[in-house]
Amino acid sequence: MPLSLDSIVVASPDQVSSDLAGETVLLSMTSAKYYGFAGVGSRIWELIATATPVRSVCDTIAAEYDVSRQECEADVLGFLEQCVKSGLVEVRSGA
């Protein structure tokens, strides 16, 4: 399913994550690979702990960081697409 601003995303239940000195560290239980996010990536991860529309994630990131809406949307979608490909995030259709 293609990712869009209307998509609902949520962290996959097939991973475990922890905050380690301000960085989010994840272990994919399906691939046994470790991942690490810092800064904005960690904040996005916090926001998708529960099912959340991508548009809402962008609203929060654009408000909290000095970034244009267009750049924010492109970066958030790119980050989430990589997470989906890695099996760390599940995508649900939008409303």
Where are these regions (language model features)?
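Long, low-complexity, charged/polar intrinsically disordered regions in eukaryotic proteins
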Residues: 1-24
